Amino acid sequence: MEINVIVKPPFKKLVSAQFLKKIASETLKAQAADPSSELGIVITGQEEIKELNCKYRQLDEPTDVLSFYMLEENPENLTAPDDFPTPPDEATHLGEVIISYPQAELQAGAAGHSVNHELAFLLIHGVLHLLGYDHHETAAEAVMKSHQDIAMKHIREILE
């Protein structure tokens, strides 16, 4: 699995790229994702995530995490869209997970846990979206929450 991490300059001393790679890798393994998959992770600030949220979700406000798919959304049939061919010898790019560090920090404080715990939760949430899980309907939300809970238990030792 190839996991590329970009931590924007204001947050470089606050976030470990290795930590994020480990969380993403463990989440993908637990979900039996294709080992040749690749994923991008970006840690950014409120302004950039607000711009992305406005542009792609028409919500003019910051958010905690955004996921941008490169695959079809059905977790039982993860394939690249027809207009995005993947050569047989190349990794399948799942997509990008963008996380707002300031929002993660706020949420961690409100929840009474560490920023790393919140970053892990948001990253798991974003990766699950890339794998096709969603929470717009009650049944789908229950399935996604179950996978999030399992992943958080799985990475508990990384957080300690």
Swiss-Prot record:
Binds 1 zinc ion. GO terms for cellular component: cytoplasm. The keyword Hydrolase applies. It is an enzyme of class 3 (hydrolase). It is found in: Cytoplasm. Zn(2+) binds at H125, H129, H135. Signal peptide: none annotated. It comes from the Bacteria. Keywords: Cytoplasm, Endonuclease, Hydrolase, Metal-binding, Nuclease, Ribosome biogenesis, rRNA processing, Zinc. GO terms for biological process: rRNA processing. HAMAP family: Endoribonucl_YbeY. Belongs to the endoribonuclease YbeY family. Single strand-specific metallo-endoribonuclease involved in late-stage 70S ribosome quality control and in maturation of the 3' terminus of the 16S rRNA. This is Endoribonuclease YbeY. It comes from Dehalococcoides mccartyi (strain ATCC BAA-2100 / JCM 16839 / KCTC 5957 / BAV1).
